[in-house]
């Protein structure tokens, strides 16, 4: 409720790897860490991040336990100029840092329960969406963007080839070009259908 009760269109970034340490304290955890690859983070008011449960010395507790933690914007810092990768500037990925933020228990959940689809029991939600294992949901979220990129690239290629001339005439009349465009289109459509 906290995340979407006031703004149903609230966005969150998710540098998911458990790069931080969550030290148990009364009513929750004290969270510290630095996460890389937080795509789109400038546009988000929340993070969903991974953290290891730590002991009082800040070392991973045994047995090993990982959490998924929700962190509101005032509790993290975006590190500007931390993403300098050729061809991926548009992702808006940056590092984020959390230093000593208190995370109430209700904003953390055992990552193993999310992975196996049993986290819904603690959330009080019983709809099918909440019973799905993370491994069934996450790939769809990532592949949707990739399919969109592929469709955009195909449209651009078709537009570019439309009036382009090659050694043997218009490339739009070239059977090899038509075959390549057709194959790309079929691959994209079949990916969307699965």
Stretches found by the model and what they are:
Residues 1-44, 61:
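Glycine-rich flavin
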Residues 27-29, 55, 89:
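Beta-strand-enriched cores of mature, soluble protein domains
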Residues 18, 43, 65, 90-97:
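A generic structural signal for well-ordered coil/turn residues at beta-strand boundaries
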Residues 192-194:
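C-terminal helix-coil-helix/basic helical segment that borders enzyme active sites and/or dimer interfaces
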Residues 34-77:
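DPxDG-like acidic metal-binding loop motif
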Residues 14-16, 51, 71-85, 90:
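Active-site glycine-rich loop that binds ribose-phosphate moieties when present
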Residues 86, 93-188:
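Glycine-rich beta->alpha junctions and the first turn(s) of the following alpha-helix
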């Amino acid at each position: 409720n906290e995340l979407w009760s006031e703004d149903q269109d609230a966005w969150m970034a998710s540098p998911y790897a458990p790069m931080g340490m969550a030290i148990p304290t009364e009513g929750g955890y004290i969270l510290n860490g630095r996460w890389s690859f937080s795509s789109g983070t400038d546009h988000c008011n929340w993070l969903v991040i991974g953290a290891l449960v730590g002991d009082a010395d800040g070392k991973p507790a045994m047995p090993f336990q990982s959490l998924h933690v929700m962190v509101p914007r005032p509790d993290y810092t975006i590190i500007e100029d931390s993403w300098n990768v050729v061809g991926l500037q548009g992702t808006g990925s940056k590092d984020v840092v959390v230093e000593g933020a208190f995370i109430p228990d209700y904003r953390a959940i055992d990552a193993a329960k999310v992975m196996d689809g049993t986290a819904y029991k603690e959330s009080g939600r019983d709809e099918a969406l909440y019973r799905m294992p993370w491994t069934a949901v996450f790939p769809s979220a990532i592949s949707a963007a990739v399919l969109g990129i592929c469709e955009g690239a195909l449209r651009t290629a078709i537009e570019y080839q439309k009036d382009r001339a090659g050694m043997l005439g218009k490339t739009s009349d070239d059977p090899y070009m038509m075959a390549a465009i057709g194959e790309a289109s079929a691959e994209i459509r079949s990916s969307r259908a699965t």
